[in-house]
Structures are given as C-alpha cells and as structure tokens.
A protein has these predicted regions:
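Conserved mixed alpha/beta catalytic, RNA-binding, or beta-rich assembly cores of soluble enzyme
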Residues: 1-49, 71-74, 91
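Short, compact, well-ordered microdomains
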Residues: 53-100
Length: 100
C-alpha cells in the first residue's frame, strides 16, 4: 500500500496520466487470499459489491495482485475480480507504482 499511495500522491508511474486531475481514493481493497473466488466468499462479494456501487472512474491493480513478482501474471482470483469490474464498465489498469 505504501508504494501505491506514494505513486498516487506524486502522480508518478501508472498515475502519471492523472497529473493534471484532482484524484480521490474511493476504495482500497485486497483479495481474500488464494482459493477465495467471487461467488464463493461472502466477504469478498461484499467488497466487490461496494466498489461496484461506488463505480469509480478506474480500478488500479498493484503488483501484489500477481501470482509472483517474477511472472507478473495475475492470479486467477484477481483475474475474476477484474473481469467483474470490466463487465460493469469500470476500466481496470494494471499497475500503481510499477507497471506490469
């Protein structure tokens, strides 16, 4: 979270495109862990629903959403969450303080 917020506040890395805009963090979430999929975890579903209700201009995924830092491949749980946001018309951006 520290690297993400630092990049956001400084409008660096993946937040550079917003350098001339006023930004507001509407939500900050982490997944519920490996093996917790949407539709199977009530707590995760509630987190997703709250973000869908807010309908932010974009959702940024941090490098911590990857299976590991080496492959830079999103884990299956996060891929499913991102797909839900995309279907709702919310752009999903890969990266905060790092681009992957």
């Amino acid at each position: 979270g520290a690297g993400c917020f630092s990049a956001l506040n400084g409008r660096t890395h993946r937040f550079r495109e917003y350098r001339d805009e006023e930004l507001q963090v509407s939500a900050f979430m982490k997944c519920s862990g490996c093996g917790h999929f949407p539709g199977q975890d009530k707590g995760l579903d509630e987190k997703i629903e709250r973000i869908l209700e807010i309908h932010p201009d974009a959702v940024h995924l941090g490098i911590c959403c990857c299976s590991d830092g080496e492959s830079r491949t999103l884990c299956k749980e996060v891929e499913m969450i991102a797909a839900i946001f995309k279907r709702a018309g919310i752009p999903v951006v890969r990266g905060t303080h790092s681009v992957f």
